[in-house]
Amino acid sequence: MGQASSHSENDLFISHLKESLKVRRIRVRKKDLVSFFSFIFKTCPWFPQEGSIDSRVWGRVGDCLNDYYRVFGPETIPITTFNYYNLIRDVLTNQSDSPDIQRLCKEGHKILISHSRPPSRQAPVTITTSEKASSRPPSRAPSTCPSVAIDIGSHDTGQSSLYPNLATLTDPPIQSPHSRAHTPPQHLPLLANSKTLHNSGSQDDQLNPADQADLEEAAAQYNNPDWPQLTNTPALPPFRPPSYVSTAVPPVAVAAPVLHAPTSGVPGSPTAPNLPGVALAKPSGPIDETVSLLDGVKTLVTKLSDLALLPPAGVMAFPVTRSQGQVSSNTTGRASPHPDTHTIPEEEEADSGESDSEDDEEESSEPTEPTYTHSYKRLNLKTIEKIKTAVANYGPTAPFTVALVESLSERWLTPSDWFFLSRAALSGGDNILWKSEYEDISKQFAERTRVRPPPKDGPLKIPGASPYQNNDKQAQFPPGLLTQIQSAGLKAWKRLPQKGAATTSLAKIRQGPDESYSDFVSRLQETADRLFGSGESESSFVKHLAYENANPACQSAIRPFRQKELSTMSPLLWYCSAHAVGLAIGAALQNLAPAQLLEPRPAFAIIVTNPAIFQETAPKKIQPPTQLPTQPNAPQASLIKNLGPTTKCPRCKKGFHWASECRSRLDINGQPIIKQGNLEQGPAPGPHYRDELRGFTVHPPIPPANPCPPSNQPRRYVTDLWRATAGSAGLDLCTTTDTILTTQNSPLTLPVGIYGPLPPQTFGLILAEPALPSKGIQVLPGILDNDFEGEIHIILSTTKDLVTIPKGTRLAQIVILPLQQINSNFHKPYRGASAPGSSDVYWVQQISQQRPTLKLKLNGKLFSGILDTGADATVISYTHWPRNWPLTTVATHLRGIGQATNPQQSAQMLKWEDSEGNNGHITPYVLPNLPVNLWGRDILSQMKLVMCSPNDTVMTQMLSQGYLPGQGLGKNNQGITQPITITPKKDKTGLGFHQNLPRSRAIDIPVPHADKISWKITDPVWVDQWPLTYEKTLAAIALVQEQLAAGHIEPTNSPWNTPIFIIKKKSGSWRLLQDLRAVNKVMVPMGALQPGLPSPVAIPLNYHKIVIDLKDCFFTIPLHPEDRPYFAFSVPQINFQSPMPRYQWKVLPQGMANSPTLCQKFVAAAIAPVRSQWPEAYILHYMDDILLACDSAEAAKACYAHIISCLTSYGLKIAPDKVQVSEPFSYLGFELHHQQVFTPRVCLKTDHLKTLNDFQKLLGDIQWLRPYLKLPTSALVPLNNILKGDPNPLSVRALTPEAKQSLALINKAIQNQSVQQISYNLPLVLLLLPTPHTPTAVFWQPNGTDPTKNGSPLLWLHLPASPSKVLLTYPSLLAMLIIKGRYTGRQLFGRDPHSIIIPYTQDQLTWLLQTSDEWAIALSSFTGDIDNHYPSDPVIQFAKLHQFIFPKITKCAPIPQATLVFTDGSSNGIAAYVIDNQPISIKSPYLSAQLVELYAILQVFTVLAHQPFNLYTDSAYIAQSVPLLETVPFIKSSTNATPLFSKLQQLILNRQHPFFIGHLRAHLNLPGPLAEGNALADAATQIFPIISDPIHEATQAHTLHHLNAHTLRLLYKITREQARDIVKACKQCVVATPVPHLGVNPRGLVPNAIWQMDVTHFTPFGKQRFVHVTVDTFSGFILATPQTGEASKNVISHVIHCLATIGKPHTIKTDNGPGYTGKNFQDFCQKLQIKHVTGIPYNPQGQGVVERAHQTLKNALNRLARSPLGFSMQQPRNLLSHALFQLNFLQLDSQGRSAADRLWHPQTSQQHATVMWRDPLTSVWKGPDPVLIWGRGSACIYDQKEDGPRWLPERLIRHINNQTAPLCDRPSNPNTAPGPKGSP
């Protein structure tokens, strides 16, 4: 112990101490004791100089350890310190009378003497206990044991220097050896106990008052639950002396084992009152504190002896093996056995750790057989029934239920008992939860108790696992283990979910005005437990809400103590308890704790002025004190004896006495003093009235120098303020604290540090600083009275969400004005420090026997009614209702005292108006037999009436928050609905007194807002507001008023305007939206700042997370002030009753294109300081969702506090109910755990999959989940195939059997998903898995704790389902996957993979790098490892090697001695190949040269399937594509070559012989056999040895164009029957198609002579269903265009198209439609000189040609819609062009001419027939003239003389070829009669 100690002496002392402990069946190691005393010397440097170790000295050691624990924390103290201390303390106090201990005392005494001898060898000094007791304040009963004579060496460092806080807690510094008296040494035992102290002879058994107070304080802390115990050691067994000393020690009565509780809250506190284990005789002298408390705790000892040892939370087992002897049945203090109990010997766990020293070997020889017992009580079925009933009625975690379960702890329940109780009492779900929690807690206990290596079966005992599942074996567990089992069972039970849904928002739980603070905290903690889980009710977030949501009175009491570190909320409950509100406020005024306020101090005296309050609120035993209790022996007693007022009486101002004791009737000025009341009658108190709050009056300290200023600076008065200049009119006022002003806490009262009174005959006017309104701060003007002596306050409010006001900001000015007194009448003669102004006078209408009536006008008619706050709607009596006002019956019920079924209601909205001009609209009900009218809440709410209850408590709280009576409770400016618009004057800088005060200066408050938007144009955009319905108009007005009150919009005169519209939500409420499309077009888009979502797998592994959600993010971000006018809108008014109110947005509007970008930038700027200050934190931010992760929970909480502060400083609001602090976390659709990430575990439903759109959505959702699922692309192929086909989104689709199997695989992958977060300390591996169809990649990390265990996947990578090329080889796909993996690794994790695992060998990799550009690019600049050894993990074993890996059959060079083949193909469909100079030609079904040649190669592979060959082709595409087929996993189906490629691939994969394909350039006329062979193949394609089949060609032509039989017969020279059979075989053509008839309508004689034009509707064309059709009547050529309408502009567009196709007509004939008869079309025809004629109205026969063309065109469109050309109805122009091509160019007439031939080639070799004809007017025969057209019974004759056509009936026409006219028709003149040519 001394510095000169020898090693042998230390060993001797430690050996004796070990022997003493072994006597108590406690084994310790020597090195642990040496370490323990080394720490004692470090903590207590005075300990070696004491010279003796008795209970007093050892108690001082405990005090030092206790203080060391408080100052430096528990982590600085070894875990076994307090255990060893308690063991030695028990030896000192209980068993020191044994011979063994006596021998140890002697040896320790000798060692201490030798160790404490100073180097100078001076004579020893004797210091008795009495001398020490006289030199220090006794902290406990002094010891009477004389100390050992010791020599005190030099002590360089005193205790006060090392521990300044302990100087006053322990003994004074020890005197030097030279200053002490030398007395002979007295040798006594080194270790003394209480028995020796009792017989020491001292008679001083009384404690002084100071020590008695300390003792009471220590006793009050006897069982402090705030400090969990560190040890879980069972109670010490009764002492049984060893056999070698049993004869020398008399038997003693031993008490039952008890649990020693700490006194000071420190775990294992050494100063815990020791309950004696030895029956002591009655003390005859003074004893220590333990003996003094013996009588007081005698009852407690008896109770504690029967209690079970229940360790608190967080227990740690003491690492000392203890064996306990058998307890006799007659042991004192042992309770009698229970009928259901039996004694079972307990076995002791053997220490499995091997000894590493001689000391361990010596201890191992001790017997370890079980030698102690405990009582085991079986479970009682009645008890289980009670618990089951409590669980069913109250819930498993109700206090009553938990108390019943805790009552079972004395039965030493085994794990089997706990499992039986859980099954019997809990529900199925709760039973599973309890088992899970119990197993987890058991594992934790097993880990915590592992100090030495535990036995192999130790962790199995607590959960009762095999082989300890038998209840008999469990009952034999030692007491310490059973104690842990009880603790684990109770903990698991208490962690069960509470009864009730955890849906209550914490932010909505607020303390009521009359609600006690303890009830409010109880509700808050209960809700927190439901939301966050058990144990989180004391979190910092809940403590924060405990202040923020408290009522104003409690907030005032808590505010001074918020910055203190409080472990629990117990101090807050003390501050705000109902009977101590006055104490808390008094303490807050002096910055003291309430406990300090009650101590004898010279600063305060609390006088009760209203004892009735104590009679109402305090318990009956508490008497109202009249002054503070004082101690007569306290050093400050003299100051408190004569405590009195230090200021003059505020009543008379003439003497120093209390106002309550003032007897004067006149004040100092001779004025009479008006009697003051106690608020029974008279005016209400002012807003700052706090003098008599709850009956306490807080007086200033003695002497009252300056009680109000917070520092030692003198008080500053208004007269001390400096003016800026000589001409300044006002004095500036600045804030004295840093303040955050929000709309929730405004109006806010702030002190300015300036006090009254004002100069005589003056008063002050407080005005706002002119520059403040521009920053959103409003200062309410006020009046400062001349006689006000308190501190001046200013009242602030804000129109913004959040404004920060730094300390020293200039806020207001006070202008001093002269005071003019009108009369001498006043309410109070003296104001003092009460509220300034006359705000303590207000008017209310008190409730009396008379009914509160109100007169209102409804549509101008006066009505009188009663104010009914219980009525939902206004009801008018039928007798008062005007008869001419309409009524309607409504299907509802009115319920009150009676009931009215289907009452009548006003059929129109009525406008109400009061006498003050306020108005609104209501729809009242009308009831008969109603005596009076009732004004319901529908009209009272519009009038903004307020119910005021003048309760003293409520009124005091309201007044303390600045409420002005009589002005309402409005949020803005005390009841004013609209804020006062203040026009700032920028040229006014104020008085500037801050220029002379360096500590007080004006600081510009930055107002954060969004970035400015760039605009393309500066001209205003105005879009008129469209009208709204009456219902939506009222909703729009209400919503606009709501946004205006919230500060989101403001009135404006902006030249910009865009319309608003109102939609109804599903909930029935309305939503305001603005159409900003026109504004978005003229603004410059900012672009996306985050192209994708952040991946949660990049969060570091094992980081603690907190998720934050911002509330109404857009509405909390202010727009740039210059951008606000661009987002203006107008509120429509019905019938233009008034000008439309116009507003503009002050915050980010919804629907603006740049709002998401501005929101992201604003939030990112808010959290930028957090990122810079916390670089080790991982913060994810996306829009309004923020996730922060730190490596420890403490860092996460600190970072959370910082980020909340930063967000709040920017005005952003946090949604408290969406803050997530515990697992599982929900973020961006993911479920985050401590290590793993899960996507939503959904089950894919198939009942709704019916259309293409449904399957497209399903596959889109699956693609979003795939990066986190083990789902290869091959599993999605059947689902992807369903998407092929008809592109119509509503086209019908159905699940195939293969698709159903794919969905099953997908559901399985979703349920078995397992993706882990990354560990940046482990290597990142990219695995390329050769899965079928396409390869798959995964980011992988090995197991960080055990490399032999399986690793974890981080992210799965997949290639797109539709590749960019038709043929992609497997090596190319792997290269693409490597590129994607490296890109993703840099994007998400910021690094390249450490290694890449590929399915190729090193030789194959070398070959790929040499021959493949994709692999060279993929591995460019990669510095990691490339390997082909996959980890042996079952997760990746599903990816077996696939056959499409490396080419085997395809060769890159010609094959020696192989067959030489040449191929070629032509567009005529002939395929040719040459084998051994023998050409072979084949007719292919294709007309593309590439497909024909591919067909030839397919024939070659079929013919030469069993021999190698070298093939040459002149197609480079074929030469490059075919060699790839061997390694192509799948072929893209978007090309016509896909079927040929698929067949070739199957032939190649089935081949056994290699092949080579080379490329030759054709038509170069080069010499050599290769060129000759290629030329021979080319020539073979030009020979057509096979006779073509005209029927086949006709069939193909009909398939493409659906030609009629007549045209097929003429074009392909087939018979009529063959043509008709082809048409009949077509399912889409009508068999009985009528033959086109020429008709009898007038037709043009030449092309473009007459057009007929009309419009037909073809519905399948959709919007372009208006098909304009034009027919040339001469040739029958049809032109048509799809249009979107029939207006003149559409007609003109069609005519322009026709003019560009066939030229300009002479005449256009149409019907009388408005599109044709309109002025626009008439002008168009006139300008182009086109004659326009119309037919007879409503007679379509005049348009017969074009009408028949309509039907012909529609039939052709319907047939061609399914043509192989692939034109559908969604392509109107293409399909229409195809139909016109078929009608105009492919349809032939009887002469084999098409309409195009007739149009462009009107002259033919055929001669017109010449006839003679008789003029019907003159009966004269004329001619011969040609016949132009033969009709039905008529003909058109061309009169060559008249040069024009003439229609004649057939009877007037005669052919001149061998025919003459009838005789009856011959003319009289034979010279003119027609006859044969050449006849006379």
From Swiss-Prot:
Its EC number is 3.6.1.23, 3.4.23.-, 2.7.7.49, 2.7.7.7. InterPro entries: Aspartic_peptidase_AS (IPR001969), B_retro_matrix (IPR003322), B_retro_matrix_sf (IPR038124), DNA/RNA_pol_sf (IPR043502), dUTPase-like (IPR029054), dUTPase-like_sf (IPR036157), dUTPase_trimeric (IPR033704), G_patch_dom (IPR000467). A zinc finger (Integrase-type) spans 1589-1630. Residues 1643-1804 form the Integrase catalytic domain. Residues 446-459 have a biased composition (Basic and acidic residues). GO terms for biological process: DNA integration; DNA recombination; establishment of integrated proviral latency; proteolysis; symbiont entry into host cell; viral genome integration into host DNA; viral translational frameshifting. This is Gag-Pro-Pol polyprotein. It comes from Squirrel monkey retrovirus.
